[in-house]
Amino acid sequence: MGCIKSKGKDSLSDDGVDLKTQPVRNTERTIYVRDPTSNKQQRPVPESQLLPGQRFQTKDPEEQGDIVVALYPYDGIHPDDLSFKKGEKMKVLEEHGEWWKAKSLLTKKEGFIPSNYVAKLNTLETEEWFFKDITRKDAERQLLAPGNSAGAFLIRESETLKGSFSLSVRDFDPVHGDVIKHYKIRSLDNGGYYISPRITFPCISDMIKHYQKQADGLCRRLEKACISPKPQKPWDKDAWEIPRESIKLVKRLGAGQFGEVWMGYYNNSTKVAVKTLKPGTMSVQAFLEEANLMKTLQHDKLVRLYAVVTREEPIYIITEYMAKGSLLDFLKSDEGGKVLLPKLIDFSAQIAEGMAYIERKNYIHRDLRAANVLVSESLMCKIADFGLARVIEDNEYTAREGAKFPIKWTAPEAINFGCFTIKSDVWSFGILLYEIVTYGKIPYPGRTNADVMTALSQGYRMPRVENCPDELYDIMKMCWKEKAEERPTFDYLQSVLDDFYTATEGQYQQQP
C-alpha cells in the first residue's frame, strides 16, 4: 500500500528528545494474543477528520462506505457466513460486535465475517508489521517467541499517547543474549515521521523501507516482520446454550474433582476444551450461576468461556483450548524444564496481570495454583477454573459447609475461618511462585496438610530455594504476610514482575 500520512501533533516536539534503553534478558517470550472478546466498533471517519494511519483516497462509488481487506482467508461454516480469500476487499454493511455483515466486492455475495480477520482499507492495520492494541511488554513477548530471530520488528501504537507509534526490534547482545530495542516514532507538525531528526519520512511505510535497506543508526537493519499467528475466529453469534450433538469429544486430557476435561470440536470446525460435570455433583442452577459468572470475566490472560450444555447430564462447559495444558504439567515436562528463569518470571507476570483484572472486577478465584493455569502453544499463560469464584459485596466470602480446598495453597484465615478474599488469592499466588521457580514441585515438601496447618500457626514460611533470586523470594514473603491487609495488590505484583529485570533501566533506545 502507499504512504499513510501523519496528522501533526502539537504535543509532540520535533527537536529530538533523547530516548532511553529497554533491554530484555535472555529468554524466549510469549506471543501476544489479542483479546478475542473485544466488542469495540470502529465507525467510518470522514475524510476531513482523518486519523494517524489514514489518508485521503478517492473510492469507487461501489466502495463508498467502510471498506475492509482480508488479512487471512476464511471458509464460512454457516449458511449466512461469507467466505473470502486473503486480500479480498469487502464493504461492511452492519457491525454486530465480533461478527460483521459484509458484501464482497469480488463475488458480490453478502454474509457475516469475523471482524478480527479483516482491517480497514488504507490503514496501518493492513501492514504485516503493524500490531494494533499491543503493549510494550507483549511486543517483547511476541518478538522473542519461537520463529522470530534478530532483525524481526513490529510497529505498535503508543500506550500513553494516542496517535503516536513505536518501533520494536529484536537484537542480539553478547552479554544479555536476545534483547528488544524500542524506538519512539515522532510526528512532524506538517506531516511525516522520524526516529532521528536528521532524516524524516512522509509515511511510516517509507520509514520501514529505508531501515530495511540499512540500519542507519538503529541497533540493526530491519529484516522480517514479527510473526503474527492467525487469530482464533470469534465464537458463533448468540451460541450460549448449545446442542450436545454439536460437540465432538476427541481426546481426554485429564480428570478433576468435578469431572473430566476433553479436547474436542464444536460443529466439527472449532477446537475447544470441554469440561464435563459428574452427574449429581451440583444442580444445573448452581452450575449455570458459575458459568454465567465466568462468562463475565473476559481478559486475554483468562481462559474464555464459550458455551454450555445443560439440558441434561452430564453438563458440559465449553472453553477455549490451550495446547500445552496446565502450567503444572508443562513445568514438569521436558520442554518446561528447559525454560530459563526470566521466562518463569514472565509466566508469573502474566498470571499477576490476569489476577489484577479479577481484582479490579471485585471477584476472587479461591483456587489459584499452577494446576489451574493453562499454557498456549505460544507459551501464553491464562488463568482457568473459576468454578468456586463468587462475586462479593463487602470483600468477604465465607466458604460453603464441606467445601474442599487445597490446604498447601490456602491462606491461614481461609483455612481456619473459611473466609476468602482477594488477599487470600494473593497468598495462593505466593505459593504458585514457589511452584513456578521449582518447576512444579509440591509446596512444603515432606509435610502433611496437618503439619502445614500447625507450622503456619507458628509463623513458619517456606525457605528460599536455591535457584530463586532474593528479590523474588521477597515477593513471596510479601504474599505470605500474616495480616491479609498487609499483602500487596495484584496490580502491584504485576508491575513489579513485569519489570523484574528492567525496573531501574529506561524503556527506549537513544536516538540514532
UniProtKB/Swiss-Prot annotation:
Residues 247-501 form the Protein kinase domain. The keyword Nucleotidyltransferase does not apply. A lipid is attached at residue 3 (S-palmitoyl cysteine). SMART domains: SH2, SH3, TyrKc. One of its GO terms (biological process) is negative regulation of toll-like receptor 2 signaling pathway. GO terms for cellular component: adherens junction; cytoplasm; cytoplasmic side of plasma membrane; cytosol; endocytic vesicle membrane; extracellular exosome; glutamatergic synapse; Golgi apparatus. Its EC number is 2.7.10.2. InterPro entries: Kinase-like_dom_sf, Lyn_SH2, Lyn_SH3, Non-receptor_tyrosine_kinases, Prot_kinase_dom, Protein_kinase_ATP_BS, Ser-Thr/Tyr_kinase_cat_dom, SH2. Subject to autoinhibition, mediated by intramolecular interactions between the SH2 domain and the C-terminal phosphotyrosine. Phosphorylation at Tyr-397 is required for optimal activity. Phosphorylated by CSK at Tyr-508; phosphorylation at Tyr-508 inhibits kinase activity. Kinase activity is modulated by dephosphorylation by PTPRC/CD45. Inhibited by Dasatinib, PP2, and SU6656. Keywords: Adaptive immunity, ATP-binding, Cell membrane, Cytoplasm, Disease variant, Golgi apparatus, Host-virus interaction, Immunity, Inflammatory response, Innate immunity, Kinase, Lipoprotein, Membrane, Myristate, Nucleotide-binding, Nucleus, Palmitate, Phosphoprotein, Proto-oncogene, SH2 domain, SH3 domain, Transferase, Tyrosine-protein kinase, Ubl conjugation. PANTHER family: TYROSINE-PROTEIN KINASE. This is Tyrosine-protein kinase Lyn. It comes from Homo sapiens (Human). The gene is LYN.
